[in-house]
C-alpha cells in the first residue's frame, strides 16, 4: 500500500479507518475523524488469579486502591514507553473497541494508525509498539516522534527551513526539540 501511488482507490479502502494514538504514561488519547474519541488514563485492572484484563482507562482508574486484593491496577507505560507489553496491548485493543463510530461498523475495519512515540525510544521499544498495533488490526502503522506530532498539531509548517522549539510536557516525560 503506497500512499503516493496513482492507482484508483482499492475496493476495500472503504473498510479502512484512520486513527491517531498518543500513548502516554498518564493518559492515552485516540483521534478518529479529527475528533478526540478516547481521552482516558493509561491504566488497566487485571485479575491476579486469571491474569485477565477486566477494565481499562477511567473504569480501571476508579478501581485503583478500592478493590479486593485479587484485582491489581497497572500502569503499562513507564517514561512514555511500554513497560508491560501484554497489558498495554490489551489496553489499546479495549480502547479501540470502545470508539463509538467503529462500534457501529458491520465488519471490523482495518486500521491505518499513526502512533506518537518519545524521541528517546529504542528500536526494540519501537518494534513493540508497532507489533502491538498490528495485533489490534493495524494494517498500516506509522510511528511519529511526539515533538514532531506536537509541531504538526499546532499548525507549524515543518517543511519550512526555519527553526522552532517545541516543548512537549507529558505525564511521564518532557521533551524539548528544535
Q: What feature does the model see in each segment?
A:
Residues 1-171, 177-178:
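Nucleotide/phosphate-binding catalytic cleft detector across ATP-hydrolyzing
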Amino acid at each position: 500500500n503506497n500512499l503516493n501511488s496513482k492507482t484508483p482507490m482499492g475496493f476495500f479502502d472503504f473498510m479502512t479507518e484512520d486513527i491517531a494514538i498518543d500513548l502516554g504514561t498518564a493518559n492515552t488519547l485516540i483521534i478518529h475523524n479529527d475528533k478526540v474519541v478516547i481521552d482516558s488514563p493509561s491504566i488497566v485492572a487485571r485479575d491476579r488469579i486469571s491474569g485477565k484484563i477486566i477494565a481499562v482507562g477511567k473504569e480501571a482508574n476508579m478501581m485503583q486502591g478500592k478493590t479486593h486484593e485479587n484485582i491489581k491496577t497497572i500502569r503499562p507505560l513507564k517514561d512514555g514507553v511500554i513497560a508491560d507489553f501484554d497489558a498495554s496491548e490489551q489496553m489499546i485493543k479495549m480502547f479501540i473497541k470502545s470508539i463509538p463510530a467503529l462500534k457501529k461498523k458491520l465488519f471490523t475495519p482495518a486500521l491505518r494508525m499513526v502512533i506518537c512515540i518519545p524521541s528517546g525510544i529504542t528500536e526494540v521499544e519501537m518494534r513493540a509498539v508497532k507489533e502491538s498495533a498490528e495485533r489490534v488490526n493495524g494494517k498500516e502503522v506509522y510511528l511519529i516522534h511526539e515533538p514532531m506530532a506536537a509541531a504538526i498539531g499546532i499548525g507549524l509548517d515543518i517543511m519550512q527551513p526555519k527553526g522552532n522549539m517545541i516543548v512537549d510536557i507529558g505525564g511521564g516525560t518532557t521533551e524539548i526539540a528544535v
